[in-house]
C-alpha cells in the first residue's frame, strides 16, 4: 500500500487503531486533514484569480452537498431503526418455526402420527441444523467453519443483531441450546466503529467462551511419545491453537501502546481486523435478514450469479482493452514494415559500387556472391 498519496494511508490509520483510543484517532485524522488543507491551499494559491473564484464557488456547492449528505445519513439511520423494529415480529415467527415452538399448517398431522411411535425422541422438531446450513452455504463463513465446529453449531438456535450508540457500532448475539461443548447460552460479538456510516473499525470485543474440559474447539492437543531411554514414560502433550469458527469470539487484540508493535505487525493486525469485520458484517447484512434463502442455497446462487455478471463485465472491459492494444500493435507493425521497406530502398540506392581499382561483381548476370571487399558496409 502506498504511503505517498494525499489520502489517509493505512500506516496513519493503523497507528491510531493501535492506540486503542478514540480521541487519539480523531486527533490523528485532524492532523492529517490539517496537512492536506495546507497542501490544497497551496494549490489554490497557484491558480489564477478567476479560476480561484470558480473553485471557491465549487467548494461552496460541495459544502451544501455535505450538509445534505449528513441529513441523509441521519434519516437513513432513523429509517433503518424503524424497519428493524418492524422486522422483529417476523424474526420471532422464524425462531418459533425453526426451533419447533410452533407447528405450521400441513405438518400437524404428520407430527401427531409421529407422536404415536414408541421412540418419540426420533421425531424431528423445527428445522434441524438451520443456522449451520445457512452459514455453510455462504462462501465467507464456510471458510471459517471446520468439521469439528459443525456438531457444536447444530445447537445454535438463533442469531440477532442490534445497533449500539455509545460508542457507535453494532453487536451480534448467538443463542445456543444447552450443549456438551460450553456453558454459555449466549455468545456476543460487539463492533465499535469510528464512524457508523463508514466501515472503520476501532475494536471488537466478544464473550469469553466457557469451554467444558476437553471440549475446546479452538485448540488441539498433540501427544508425542517420550524418547527412548527417557525416565518419564508418559506421552508428552502440547496444546496448539487451531482453525475454528469459534475463533470469531477471540477478536484481534489492539495494543494499548502503539510503540509495542512494529510496522509489519501493524499491517497484519489491520488485515486481521478487516477480515474479522467482513465476517461480522456478512452475518449481519446477509445471513440474519435472508436466513432461509441461505439455508436452501438460493441466496448462494444469486451471489454466484452476481459475481459472474461482475466477472463478465470485467472480461468485456479487458477484451476491449486487448482489442485496442491489438489494433495499436497492428498499426505499429505496419509502421515498422513501412520503415523497413524505406530502409531497403535506400540501401539498394546506396549499393552502387564506387570507382576503385577493385574488381566489381561478376558482369555476366550470374548471382555469384560479391567478394567481401565489395559488400555494402
Curated annotation (Swiss-Prot):
Pro-piece positions: 375-377
MF (Gene Ontology): chromatin binding; histone binding
Biased composition, class Acidic residues, residue ranges: 299-342
Keyword DNA damage attached: no
Annotated lipid attachment (S-farnesyl cysteine): 374
Gene3D superfamilies in the cross-refs: 1.20.5.1500, Nucleosome assembly protein
Entries under SUPFAM superfamilies matching the protein: NAP-like (SSF143113)
GO CC aspect terms: chromatin; cytoplasm; nucleus
Ranges spanned by the short sequence motif Nuclear export signal, renumbered to the chain: 47-62
Keywords of the record: Chaperone, Coiled coil, Cytoplasm, Lipoprotein, Methylation, Nucleus, Prenylation
Record region (Disordered): 298-377
Pfam families linked to this entry: NAP (PF00956)
PANTHER family in alphabetical order: TESTIS-SPECIFIC Y-ENCODED PROTEIN (PTHR11875)
Role this protein plays: May modulate chromatin structure by regulation of nucleosome assembly/disassembly. Could function together with B-type cyclins in the regulation of microtubule dynamics.
Written domain comment of the UniProt record: The acidic domain is probably involved in the interaction with histones.
Family the UniProt entry places it in: Belongs to the nucleosome assembly protein (NAP) family.
Protein's recorded name: Nucleosome assembly protein 1;2
Organism this protein belongs to: Nicotiana tabacum
Gene that specifies this protein: NAP1;2
Amino acid at each position: 500500500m502506498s504511503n505517498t498519496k494525499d489520502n489517509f494511508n493505512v500506516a496513519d490509520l493503523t497507528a491510531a487503531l493501535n492506540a486503542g483510543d478514540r480521541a487519539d484517532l480523531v486527533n490523528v485524522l485532524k492532523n492529517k486533514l490539517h496537512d492536506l488543507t495546507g497542501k490544497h491551499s497551496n494549490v489554490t494559491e497557484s491558480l489564477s484569480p478567476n479560476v480561484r473564484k470558480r473553485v471557491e464557488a465549487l467548494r461552496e456547492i460541495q459544502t451544501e452537498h455535505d450538509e445534505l449528505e449528513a441529513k441523509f445519513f441521519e434519516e437513513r439511520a432513523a429509517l433503518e431503526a424503524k424497519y428493524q423494529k418492524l422486522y422483529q415480529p417476523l424474526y420471532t415467527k422464524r425462531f418459533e418455526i425453526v426451533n419447533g415452538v410452533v407447528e405450521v399448517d400441513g405438518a400437524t398431522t404428520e407430527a401427531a402420527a409421529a407422536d404415536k411411535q414408541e421412540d418419540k425422541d426420533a421425531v424431528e422438531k423445527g428445522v434441524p441444523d438451520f443456522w449451520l446450513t445457512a452459514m455453510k452455504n455462504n462462501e465467507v463463513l464456510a471458510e471459517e467453519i471446520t468439521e469439528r465446529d459443525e456438531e457444536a453449531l447444530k445447537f445454535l438456535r438463533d442469531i440477532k443483531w442490534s445497533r449500539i450508540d455509545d460508542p457507535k457500532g453494532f453487536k451480534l448475539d448467538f443463542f445456543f441450546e444447552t450443549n456438551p461443548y460450553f456453558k454459555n447460552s449466549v455468545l456476543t460479538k460487539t463492533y465499535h466503529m469510528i464512524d457508523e456510516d463508514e466501515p472503520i473499525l476501532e475494536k471488537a470485543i466478544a464473550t469469553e467462551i466457557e469451554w467444558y474440559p476437553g471440549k475446546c474447539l479452538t485448540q488441539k492437543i498433540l501427544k508425542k511419545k517420550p524418547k527412548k531411554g527417557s525416565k518419564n514414560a508418559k506421552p508428552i502433550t502440547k496444546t496448539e491453537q487451531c482453525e475454528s469458527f469459534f475463533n470469531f469470539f477471540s477478536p484481534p487484540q489492539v495494543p494499548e501502546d502503539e510503540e509495542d508493535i512494529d510496522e509489519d505487525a501493524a499491517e497484519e493486525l489491520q488485515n486481521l481486523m478487516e477480515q474479522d469485520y467482513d465476517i461480522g458484517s456478512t452475518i449481519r447484512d446477509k445471513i440474519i435478514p435472508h436466513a432461509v434463502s441461505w439455508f436452501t442455497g438460493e441466496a448462494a446462487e444469486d451471489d454466484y450469479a452476481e459475481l459472474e455478471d461482475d466477472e463478465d463485465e470485467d472480461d468485456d472491459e479487458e477484451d476491449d482493452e486487448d482489442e485496442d492494444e491489438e489494433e495499436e500493435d497492428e498499426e505499429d507493425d505496419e509502421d515498422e514494415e513501412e520503415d523497413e521497406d524505406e530502409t531497403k530502398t535506400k540501401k539498394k540506392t546506396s549499393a552502387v559500387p564506387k570507382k576503385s581499382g577493385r574488381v566489381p561483381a561478376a558482369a555476366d548476370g550470374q548471382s555469384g556472391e560479391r567478394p567481401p571487399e565489395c559488400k555494402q558496409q
